[in-house]
């Protein structure tokens, strides 16, 4: 099901009604039915929500991520606008999962992502459970074609490579993708040994996945992480980036399905986002697993909104470096 964008969520402080240097996101956002989009020349981005936590339910996690797209957009609304005035940012609404129809909703998400990419609009997808990533992948693959070598970088505490004989969930997506698509590679950053069984490590190794443990990602070791990322990227024509908020320490992101006591510092995640988005191969981004129902003082929601803004700013900086605008 598709929900058109709603102006009511785009409200906030107004420091000036005329000076664009004082504007906030809610003063610049454009609402657009995804069926009405037209091809853009450059500097166009779209926020697309995926209201779904059926995959989390199937994976025996804490439900509530269904509500995240609306809440993250509300938090984004009041952030300062740090993009050039000519930059276009659309809210194109939400794809929703109703009646437990996960697979159908992922298909519809894929169609929406494909439409954005094919109209030269960079998608920023706001989930939802991490089952969002499978729908995101479907759209990227449809947009770039089956012969394009596609790399997936997942910033996550978990491999999400469980068996799926009983059906897909928020813990199976990357195994599904690797089984279905011979032109895909998978890199996971932030893996928690205590969040993955020995069998899942064996699965990741058997599938030839690249991964970096959480304890190996510090400010002192970021350069080594960048080298690993570069080695991975060089094998692919296109990248999609996905961020699961449970990769962060529970003190920074308590509002997730599976909180992590040994998670990453937000500054590490921010550095990884900036670095990966700076690469010309990266064409889309999703952020998942915010659970507003268990959040503390909207802390996780605010952090997710900040990461979305970081993504937008650094996608634009890369485009500006390439085009001079």
From Swiss-Prot:
Pathway: Amino-acid degradation; L-histidine degradation into L-glutamate; L-glutamate from N-formimidoyl-L-glutamate (hydrolase route): step 1/1. Keywords: Histidine metabolism, Hydrolase, Manganese, Metal-binding. Mn(2+) 2 binds at residues 156, 158, 244, 246. It holds the Pfam family Arginase. Mn(2+) 1 binds at residues 130, 156, 160, 244. Catalyzes the conversion of N-formimidoyl-L-glutamate to L-glutamate and formamide. Belongs to the arginase family. This is Formimidoylglutamase. It comes from Geobacillus sp. (strain WCH70). The lineage of its organism: Bacteria, Bacillati, Bacillota, Bacilli, Bacillales. The gene is hutG.
């Amino acid at each position: 099901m598709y929900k058109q964008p709603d102006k009511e969520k785009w409200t906030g402080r107004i420091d000036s009604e005329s000076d664009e240097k004082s504007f906030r996101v809610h003063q610049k956002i454009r609402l657009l039915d995804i069926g009405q989009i037209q091809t853009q020349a450059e500097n166009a981005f779209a926020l697309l929500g995926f209201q779904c936590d059926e995959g989390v339910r199937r994976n025996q996690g804490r439900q509530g991520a269904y509500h995240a797209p609306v809440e993250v957009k509300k938090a984004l609304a009041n952030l300062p606008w740090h993009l050039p005035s000519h930059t276009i940012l659309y809210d194109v609404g939400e794809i929703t999962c109703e009646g437990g129809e996960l697979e159908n909703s992922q298909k519809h998400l894929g169609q929406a992502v494909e439409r954005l990419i094919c109209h030269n609009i960079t998608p920023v997808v706001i989930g939802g459970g991490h089952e969002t990533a499978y729908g995101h992948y479907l759209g990227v693959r449809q947009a770039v074609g089956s012969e394009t070598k596609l790399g997936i970088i997942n910033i996550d505490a978990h491999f999400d490579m469980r068996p799926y004989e009983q059906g897909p969930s928020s813990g199976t997506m990357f195994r599904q993708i690797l089984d279905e698509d011979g032109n895909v590679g998978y890199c996971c950053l932030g893996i928690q040994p205590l969040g993955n069984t020995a069998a899942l490590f064996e699965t990741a190794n058997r599938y030839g996945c690249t991964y970096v443990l959480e304890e190996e990602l510090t400010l002192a070791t970021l350069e080594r992480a960048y080298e690993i990322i570069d080695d991975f990227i060089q094998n692919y024509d296109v990248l999609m980036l996905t961020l699961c908020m449970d990769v962060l320490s529970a003190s920074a992101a308590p509002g997730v399905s599976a909180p992590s006591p040994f998670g990453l510092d937000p500054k590490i995640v921010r550095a990884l986002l900036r670095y990966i988005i700076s690469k010309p191969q990266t064409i889309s981004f999703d952020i998942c697993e915010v659970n507003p129902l268990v959040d503390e003082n909207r802390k996780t929601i605010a952090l997710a909104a900040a990461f979305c803004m970081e993504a937008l700013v650094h996608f634009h900086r890369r485009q500006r470096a390439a085009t001079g605008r």
